[in-house]
Amino acid sequence: MPPTLRAMVKIQRLTGMRPGEIFGMRVGDIDRSRGNGLWYYIPGSYKTEKFVGKIKFPLGKPEQELLAPYLIGKKSGEAVFSPRTAQAERKAEKRANRQTKLTPAQVARDEARVEQPYRYSEFYNRFSYRQAIEHAINKGNKTLPEDEQIPYWTPYRLRNSAATATEEKIGLDEAQAQLGHKSANMTRRYSKAQLRIREKLARDRQKHNPFDDGLEGERAAK
């Protein structure tokens, strides 16, 4: 799995974000100015925005370390995670693992592709994100014996897994707050409480990265 896609999967699994919230993330949506040890992801567009304004996702140290390399040298409106970056990573890995020298024709072909920067979209969408994960799983399974195959899963599975882990560790209310599950009226009333719970979860991840224990889906993220 390319590092870009791996970072997306891990952040979504840690925070319980919707797929659209992870692949729609822009550099300018990340607030690093609070001085409390947490960053905040404030999506520019959110389905409950008309009721409660900007929804905030507190980001602890594990998420910050995954995000940091993808914020460097980018403008505010640029995608944090881009298919273009993932494709460049795949090409670099393929080149590094290559056993034979490139032929002149292959060099010319690669140079021609470099001159087409818009061949890949800047942003993932729900189809390309799901397909990228499926491709990574299929690729990984080619090297694994049949009894160790990674089962197919979708981006929404990561969100559900995050909520399940939170419910088992802390409670149902905290899991609902992590996902933002409330009616429109209830969301307005409980938005501040949800943010406090999300901050608590982020601070817990500051102390202990759940991936250190081996989370579901981690094999596919390698």
Named regions from a protein language model:
Residues 28-37, 142, 151-152, 170-191, ...:
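Short, polar N-cap/turn motifs at the start of nucleic acid-interacting alpha helices
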Residues 103-105, 109, 113, 140-152:
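Short helix/loop segment immediately N-terminal to the Walker
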Residues 1-23, 35, 73, 87, ...:
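Basic, Lys/Arg- and aromatic-enriched nucleic-acid-binding interface segment
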Residues 47-135:
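C-terminal catalytic core of Y-nucleophile DNA break-rejoin enzymes
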Residues 85, 113, 185-188, 200-222:
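C-terminal secondary-structure termini that scaffold catalytic or DNA-interacting sites
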Residues 11-12, 165-169, 178:
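Short alpha-helical segment immediately N-terminal to, or the first helix within
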Residues 4, 124-131, 146-169:
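Short basic/aromatic active-site micro-motif
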Residues 45-49, 87, 172, 179-204:
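Catalytic-site neighborhood detector that most strongly recognizes the C-terminal catalytic loop/helix
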